[in-house]
Each structure stands twice: as C-alpha cells, then as structure tokens.
Amino acid sequence: MTGSKNKARAQAKLEKRASAQAKAAAEREAANAGRGAGKNRDKGKGKAGSKTDAVAEAKAGSKSKVVAETKEGARPESKAVAKGTSDFNHKAENKYARSARKDKPSSDSWFWAGEDSGINSWFWKGEEVSNNSVAKCENKPSTSIQARVEEHTPRTSHKSRSGAEEEEEENVIGNWFWEGDDTGFDSDPKPVFKIVKPQPVDEINEKDRPKDWSEVTIWPKAPAVTPAVLGYRSQDSSEGRPSSYIVLASNEEETSTTCTKNTRSSLQPIPEYPFGSDPCIQTLDEIRQQIKIREENGIKPFACPCKMECYLDSPEFEKLVNILKSTTDPLIHKIAQIAMGIHKVHPFAQEFINEVGVVTLIESLLSFSSPEVSIKKAVITLNSSGDDRQQMVEFHVKHMCKETVSFPLNSPGQQSGLKIIGQLTTESVHHYIVVSYFSELFHLLSQGNRKTRNLVLKVFLNMSENPKAARDMINMKALAALKLIFNQKEAKANLVSAVAIFINIKEHIRKGSIVVVDHLSYNTLTAIFREVKGIIERM
C-alpha cells in the first residue's frame, strides 16, 4: 500500500514536471520566433523564463533522484525517453513529450541539454546582439532546428564573427588613418633642394692682354685725391711725366691746383697704393712746421694716424726737397714719402731707408737712374783706365763721409753712413780720404750714443791697421776720446775695439813704422798707454 502511494506520488510529480517542461518548450519556441523577427526585448524575457524554469526543475529533479535510483530497470527506458525528448525538441510535438517525460533520467538529460543550449546561447546571443550580428538571421526561416544548431555552436560563431569584427575595425581605422595621411601630405612630393647662385667669373678679354713685356706696367695710375708727394711742377713736364707722378704743392699753389684735382677726380678711379700704404694729404709747409715743433719741443705732433715716425731734420728736409725738384721719377718720390713718414709701410722698409740715408739713397739712384748713364757706367767699368775708376771711387767715399757727418747726431742716416764707411775702410786705398774727417769722427765718438760709438770704433780699428792712418790718430784729442771708452758702463764690444786700436798703435811704434820725434809727445803718449793699461787690468 505504501509502495503504491509512493508510486502515485512519483507519477504525479513526473506529470507536473512534464507540464512544466512543455510550458518551458513553448516559451522557448516563442522566444526563438521573437528573435527571428528582431524583437530583442521579448527574447531576453524568454531566455530569463527558460533559465528560471530550468533551475526549478533541477531542484525538483534532485529531490526525486533518490526514488528513481531504486528502479534499476528504468535505465534502458531512460535512454528511449531521452531520445524521445530530443525528437520532441526538434519536432515540437506535445504527445511525444508527455510520454517521454515520465522517467526521471530524462529530466536530467533535458536539464543539461537545456542548460547547454539555453545559458550558452543566451550568453553568446547577447554578445552577438551587441555586435550587431542579428541581421544575418532575419533573411532565414525561423525554425527551431536552425535555432538549436546556432545554440549548440556558439563558440565557433563567436570566433568567426569576432575575426570579422576585427577586420572591420582594422579597415575603418586604416582607411581613416591613410585618408588623413593622404590629405595631409602630397602623394607626389617634389624634391627639396638649395639653389646655389654661381659666383660671377670675370672673363679675360684676349684683346686687352699685353702682347709684350714692354706693355706691362708695375706702378698704378694716379689716384683721384692727390696724396702728399714731393716734386716740382714744371710747366713743360706735365705731358712727359709718368701716370704715377703726383705733385705736392705749397700753400700758394694749393688754391691754383684745386680745380685741376676736382677735374681729375671725376675721370680717374682711386687705385691701391704700392707697399701696402695709405695716402696722407699734407703740404710742404705743414711738414716743415711739424719738423720745427719736433726740434724745438722734442715731440712728434703728427695729427694723422696713418703717419709714421719721421727722422728728418730741417736741413735734411730742405736738401731732400731741392733734390726732388729736379726729378720726376715715381720711385724716388715714393722713397721720399716713406722717409718723411707720409706713407705707412712695413717697419722694415722705413728702417732700411733711414739706415741707408734717404738723401744718399736718392742721390745714388739719380746717379744711375737713366739707361744712358747705366750704359755709360758699364762702358767705363769695362774699357776705362784705372784712373777713371779710381776717381769714381774717391768721389763716392768723399760723398759718404760728407753725408755722414752732416746728419744729426745718433740719427739713423748717420749710423747707416758709418756702416758704409766701415765697409769702405776695409781697403787701405781709401784711408787717406777718411783721414780728412777724423776730427768729425772723434767728435761723434765722444758725443754719440753706444751704437754710434760702436760704428765709429769699427772705422778707427780698420784704419789703425794702416801705419799712415794710425800716425794721424796719435794726438791728444784722439787719445783722450779713446781713453773715455774705458769705463764700467761701456759695452764689451766697444771695449774690445778700443783695446785693439791701442794694441795696433803700440805695435806700429815698436816696429818703427811710426816714429815720434817730439819728446813731449812721446812722454804724453807713454803716460796715456800706461793709464789705459792700468784701467784694463782693473776692469
């Protein structure tokens, strides 16, 4: 009795479950149909209902599982019921559903099948709706078989659709990126390069080139602004002057030549000057005034910054002006400008001119400047007699001695002249000419500076080797000047030269080349030699 009651209860429960399952199946079909028609809201509700029903049935099935296990013969029947349940799901027939759901194991198989097809399909379908992929199902018939196939294969469809979505996103982003790139950049850019302007090249005109060396000129043309150049403006020599000849006029002549300078300035360009010098416009009177101020006050009032130091004094300047009045040679005028400090040149050039002596140098150039004089000199040198050559040499030595003693004391011109005289006195044939200037040379020895004394002592040393010249050196004035050399402040070279001079004179007296007749002079000479010997020993 009790067993029949339990069986009746179990059967009632099964019928109740079958009705619930039929209701759930109908709701699922309605949900599938609504999804095919594009009703997303109804589909969500159907899925939620099916899910709750499946959970409720799972709870009921777990309670009746104990009763169903007592029936061992129900397993083959459960297989048939499970098969019928699947057929019912595919065909949607209620008759087969009621007979097939009388066994307990069929509920379990339906539950797990429903869970796989319901929950998974709900999960993946929801994502498909978010990705706008439901439109593919609208063109197909809404059947339960197609819906079931879609529910059993959610992962494959997700993978394929997600790949399509990635490709679509890549296409969208890529198209936007490259379209922006195309609009931002030129598809056919032009090359960027720098235009280098070629430098103009001066073409050489073959017609203007000189055909012979005689057409080549070294000195430039005269500038438009006349710089300070010494010279004499003769009326008939303007046509025969070279192009580089420039005139320096005095104050009286400046007013008369202003119009001529203005006319030339509009016709001739200003060229560069030789020696790397710059012009300095000054008149003869201005230079004279500057020399006078320097001699009176001992200063150099050069207002122009391009001027260099001028070593000329008033007599030498006037002599230079008188010499330049007789010539139009541009080289001589340029040397005069450098000597006067009018042109700023390399210090070596000015030092050379000052040491040689500008007057001496210009006179030497004037003596051999013209080609006729040079040819005549060569003929005389080769074919003339010894008397003519000797006369020329004597004239040169006399001229150098005269120029040297006429220079200011310790001036560069004087020192240059002493150097030349020292070279000329290496031969004894010229000593008799220099002897006539002994008094002036001894004055330079006693009054000159250290360099001047050194040059004078070299001249005396050369002449002391000649007995005839040494005899003229034995007098009180000469020996007193030589004795002044021996002091503690004198240069060593000067002391050596002075000692050598005394030794040469002593040797001439000892050998008898020099005979002293006057006893007073001999005693004086002996006393001087003993005094000098004592000074040398003490030093």
UniProtKB/Swiss-Prot annotation:
Residues 1-10 have a biased composition (Basic residues). Keywords: Cytoplasm, Nucleus. GO terms for biological process: learning or memory; negative regulation of neuron apoptotic process; positive regulation of dendritic spine morphogenesis; positive regulation of neurogenesis; positive regulation of synapse assembly. Residues 132-146 have a biased composition (Polar residues). Residues 66-80, 88-106 have a biased composition (Basic and acidic residues). InterPro entries: ARM-like, ARM-rpt_dom, ARM-type_fold, GASP1-3. GO terms for cellular component: cytosol; nucleus. The keyword Protease does not apply. Residues 1-111, 132-170 are annotated as: Disordered. It is found in: Cytoplasm; Nucleus. One of its GO terms (molecular function) is protein homodimerization activity. It holds the Pfam family Arm_2. Belongs to the GPRASP family. Survival and differentiation promoting protein that plays a role in the regulation of neurosynaptogenesis. Induces phosphatase PP2A activity which results in APP dephosphorylation and inhibits BACE1-mediated processing of APP. Homodimer. This is G protein-coupled receptor associated sorting protein 3. It comes from Rattus norvegicus.
